[in-house]
């Protein structure tokens, strides 16, 4: 429902309520999982349950929306990294570092979120893979990334490092250290080539 196009802009209060609901739903799902009661999400957003159901008539609508907007954000991150003037491994660093910094804003299947049933989301997910493949191809051409590295390898690494860890203040520095180690091992001079 939230993706359906309309010929008119939503009222400002409706748009604000939807943003409040999305932020509250993301936080609640990170805190309680995908089965968090819809009433909890509405209460956390400071709106009535009727407002939630006007925007998202069923739990699946909300979950699909959260997954879709998360993939859209990941695509923006991938495109920004691909367009940067850095090396391929630098672009991958930028891409994964963005996922780490946005970990509490993303609801994705590899983060424990639901897979989306929306065809539009599959298209965005495929676009993410294509952009990451372009970065990998750039690295293959300059010899900084081995031939057998795939977009899925990079995406899984990003998902692992971007897991929400609210009680560990040193997690960001640990993630960046692990990222540096992983990216250093992507080079084509490794024994697996």
Label for each model-derived stretch:
Residues 1-35, 39-44, 61-64:
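Basic, helix-initiating cap at the start of DNA-binding domains
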Residues 1-5, 129-148, 167-193:
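C-terminal peripheral helix-coil segments that are non-catalytic and often amphipathic
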Residues 3, 15, 19, 23, ...:
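Generic detection of well-ordered alpha-helical segments
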Residues 20, 40, 90-98, 153-157, ...:
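Amphipathic alpha-helical interaction segments
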Residues 33-34, 54, 146:
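Helix-turn-helix/winged-helix DNA-binding modules
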Residues 46-56:
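Short hydrophobic/aromatic patch on the recognition helix
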Residues 61, 94, 98-134, 159-168:
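Short secondary-structure transition hinges
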Residues 65, 72, 76-105, 120:
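Hydrophobic alpha-helical connector segments
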